[in-house]
Regions:
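Alpha-helical, largely C-terminal catalytic domains
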Residues: 1-406
Length: 406
């Protein structure tokens, strides 16, 4: 916890509680609800899976020498995710048809609905322009491909469950056709590389691990959905902290991948980690070995380097020197004062830890507000509020985000 510089008064984050509640609505939006699903798919999980796939496609494109702006990719991903949250009641076939005839009206409605929530971070005019006239550039092609690949991953489960149900074959053919149209983006990545397909499937399986699994809760967010919440919070709060472009990107990706090792060891609950002496360090060592055997062996050296940077010591403040060696700073103030420029590829682990706690706090508080309660949820929310209600980072009053949800 860091006190503000005495000369500067504390600033309130521009992140709105209304916006955070909207993001969590994504965990209640059922997907494929007109199909016989063997399990429940929700929008928040699909969007997180889409973001992970988009990262792999973007990294592969950059490795093949293509010019690509990751910050723009993340911003456009956020635009598409928010559009889906606002227009949740429109079924995809109708939505795509309306986009052909009423794209400007739909875009204006989305922007108007989000005006009070995101105008401090994004230009509403840029949002409207993007949603009504998506530019035909590599970033949007990657997002489209990631969207269809994540949808295919879900629908393959439905298809194998009941391939003869009405309309199922037509949906499968349409998704396969869309992926075929963008297969040039999968060159050297998916194609015949079964190992990478397994990795993407492994990412998707994080949706099966539920958070707070020992207590009833609504909505029942997954580890996968939680990672996207942390990523978006970290990305947006980077603007409040005036983080450089690469640090902002790293906060999104660091949030997105911070729980990836948990699919290999399962989500061992924090009280057990903290109560058994030496257990947490032992788990970390096991996670490293499992990541090497089951993740890093499937990906390029560049992706390996990124994932290690985002999953090992994920909540420590760090940057990379000229030789790409990871250096840890003594605190966030040192990181921002000396290494807040793109060349250092900095990560404020403290910020991501606060976002991780904020996501957990909201999971508990939102369930309690729905009337779904348990001692674990009540105690968990109280403990997080006590821990974080006065948290400050540089001159930013992050505790306000917790106090506003009391």
């Amino acid at each position: 916890m860091y006190a503000a510089h005495p000369i500067k008064p504390l600033k309130a984050p521009k992140l709105k509680t209304k916006f955070l509640r909207r993001v969590f609505v994504g965990a209640s939006i059922r997907r494929w609800n007109d199909q016989a699903c063997p399990l429940e798919f929700v929008e928040l999980d699909k969007q997180a899976h889409k973001a992970m796939i988009a990262y792999l496609l973007a990294k592969d494109s950059k490795d093949r020498g293509k010019d690509l702006d990751l910050d723009l990719l993340i911003k456009y991903f956020c635009f598409e995710f928010l559009e889906r949250l606002v227009l949740t009641d429109i079924k995809p076939p109708i939505f795509y048809a309306l986009q052909q005839t009423h794209s400007q009206e739909l875009a204006s409605y989305v922007a108007q609905s989000l005006q009070d929530e995101i105008s401090a971070y994004f230009s509403l005019e840029e949002l409207k322009e993007y949603l009504s006239h998506r530019p035909q550039i590599l970033e949007t092609q990657i997002l489209e491909s990631a969207h269809f690949y994540a949808s295919k991953w879900e629908f393959d489960i439905i298809y194998h469950f009941n391939p003869n149900m009405y309309g199922v074959k037509e949906i499968k053919d349409k998704i396969d056709k869309q992926l075929h149209n963008n297969e040039h983006l999968f060159e050297g990545l998916f194609g015949e590389k079964e190992d990478l397909k397994k990795l993407v499937s492994m990412f998707g399986q994080l949706r099966f691990q539920k958070r707070w699994s020992q207590t009833p809760r609504v909505p029942q967010t997954s580890v996968l959905g939680h990672t996207l919440c942390v990523a978006i919070m970290g990305y947006l709060l980077s603007f409040d902290l005036k983080a450089c472009k690469n640090m902002r990107i790293n906060h999104f990706l660091g949030g997105l991948f911070h729980d990836l090792p948990e699919i290999l060891t399962r989500d061992i609950i924090t009280p057990i980690k903290q109560s058994v002496a030496g257990l947490d360090n032992c788990i970390k060592e096991i996670e490293k070995k499992e990541m090497q055997n089951k993740v890093y062996s499937f990906v390029s050296l560049g992706v390996q380097e990124d994932l290690k940077y985002f999953t090992e010591n994920e909540f420590k403040n760090r940057y990379k020197d000229k030789s790409h060696k990871i250096i840890f700073t003594k605190d966030a103030e040192e990181l921002f004062m000396l290494y807040n420029s793109d060349e250092y590829l900095g990560v404020c682990g403290e910020l991501l830890k606060v976002c991780d706690h904020l996501s957990a706090f909201l999971e508990a508080q939102i369930s309690l507000s729905h009337g779904i309660s348990s001692n674990d949820l009540i105690k968990g929310a109280q403990n997080l509020l006590e821990l974080r209600s006065q948290t400050e980072l540089l001159d930013l009053d992050l505790g306000k985000l917790f106090r506003d949800f009391k």
